[in-house]
């Protein structure tokens, strides 16, 4: 007999509602939602455990109690049954992209050829529910690591996504921000000539980061404004990322002023630029020689105190001092937040992204 533990990450707007596992095992109700396993909410997961004989194979689905509210993927499709064969104790972790009875917006793919990068980059684009009605333009939320921001099935690290579409939809329905077009920039698989992953090559200032920032500011934005109804005003554009993505977004703020009006920088990897910034004080020297930050923009920074993030406190403290010295208003034009228990993970960024949006759009 083995213990099978289910650990489910549910959509952020209904994550405290009951979640059930139903499937082809007696402990899961034999496909009867009325007899399914009800999970318990222990933030940020819904959890539950069953016992199963070794060698048993079972299939299962995730619902909110009936087939009308079963889980769907990021595209609104009902996925195939999940399967598990029992040999040892196991923890099955899954992320629900959305529910059938509330799926909203539309997710699509696009590609852009870049002269600057001498290649193509794939885009994942989420259009808000009202996009198909009328001819109005929408603010743009542009995010790095596009494979990780919408769809848990494509998230590179832990099958947990940022729930970017869910956060924007939830906050827009609550009046905390306007509806927006959300675009994720995907990075190619494989390695560069420098033996770095293509993602690290795209974003690192020691490698291709400057060229990638130029691509974003001078090629990608005009493409999006031409092919989608995005608002081209600076104050309507947000650029965001985590880790190296946050660092590249900050580089865009410095090197391409006047383009974006909002920046969401989660777990900014200042220590990853050791060749450029060999110590924390070098960050200030680098800031002093860069073009002045646009005084009219709004910037959100955060870092946790777990894993890689516990290295970032000193850099962020210096950055905050620099901005205040330059006359920036803490809490209004910028904020730097330390997140107790926060780490350098997609799950942690998923929890924190909503706060970034709330601050930047308030």
Which role fits each region the language model picked out?
Residues 88-101:
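Short, structured interface segments
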Residues 3, 11-55, 65-88:
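Aromatic-rich carbohydrate-binding modules that target alpha-glucans
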């Amino acid at each position: 007999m083995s213990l099978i533990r289910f650990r489910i990450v549910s959509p952020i707007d209904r994550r405290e509602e009951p979640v059930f596992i139903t499937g082809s095992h007696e402990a899961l109700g034999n496909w009867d939602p009325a007899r399914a396993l009800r999970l318990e909410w222990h933030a940020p997961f819904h959890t539950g455990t069953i016992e199963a004989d070794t060698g048993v194979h079972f299939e299962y689905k995730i619902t909110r109690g009936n087939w009308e509210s079963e889980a769907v993927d990021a595209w609104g499709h009902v996925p195939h049954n999940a399967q598990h064969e029992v040999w040892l104790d196991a923890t099955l972790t899954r992320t629900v992209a959305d529910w059938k009875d509330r799926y909203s917006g539309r997710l699509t793919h696009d590609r852009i050829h870049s002269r600057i990068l001498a290649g193509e980059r794939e885009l994942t684009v989420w259009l808000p529910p009202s996009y198909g009605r009328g001819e109005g333009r929408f603010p743009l939320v542009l995010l790095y690591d596009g494979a990780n921001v919408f769809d848990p099935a494509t998230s590179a690290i832990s099958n947990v996504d940022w729930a970017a579409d869910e956060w924007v939809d939830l906050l827009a329905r609550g009046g905390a921000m306007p509806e927006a077009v959300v675009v994720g920039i995907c990075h190619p698989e494989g390695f560069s000539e420098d033996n770095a992953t293509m993602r690290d090559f795209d974003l690192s200032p020691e490698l291709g980061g400057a060229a990638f920032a130029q691509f974003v500011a001078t090629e990608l934005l005009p493409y999006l404004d031409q092919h989608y109804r995005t608002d081209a005003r600076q104050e309507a554009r947000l650029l965001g990322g985590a880790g190296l993505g946050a660092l590249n977004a900050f580089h865009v703020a410095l090197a391409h002023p006047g383009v974006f009006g909002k920046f969401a920088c989660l777990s900014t990897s200042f220590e990853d630029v050791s060749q450029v910034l060999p110590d924390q004080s070098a960050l200030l020297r680098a800031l002093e020689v860069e073009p002045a930050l646009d005084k009219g923009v709004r910037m959100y920074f955060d870092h946790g105190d777990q894993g890689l993030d516990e290295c970032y406190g000193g850099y962020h403290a210096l950055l905050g001092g620099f901005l205040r010295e330059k006359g920036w208003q803490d809490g209004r034009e910028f904020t730097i937040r330390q997140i107790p228990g926060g780490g350098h993970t997609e799950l942690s960024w998923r929890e924190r992204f909503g706060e970034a949006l709330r601050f930047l759009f308030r």
